[in-house]
Amino acid sequence: RLERLFEHILKRCYVNMPECYRGWLLTIFDQRRDINKLFRQSPSLKRHFLKMFDDCFETSLKRIKIEYPDHQFPNTWQFGRDIDMILNADFWE
């Protein structure tokens, strides 16, 4: 779920395709909702969040570079790594 969330945040931030924004935002919403559910069901998962962060981001970045080869994406996460921020912030605004 975290990889899918990163993919769609990256798309929304760096791919200028307004006709796709709605779909990407819905996916971001769904992934955030599902991650929050997982954290409520198993709060101990939060401890592993930062450990998984870099691997998930790197996997997402590789995938999105294949999907959008003509677009530029940062090689590192450009925003805060706080769980609450990732699950709530509108990074594209």
Model segments located where?
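Surface/interface-facing alpha-helical segments and adjacent flexible terminal/loop regions used
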Residues: 1-93
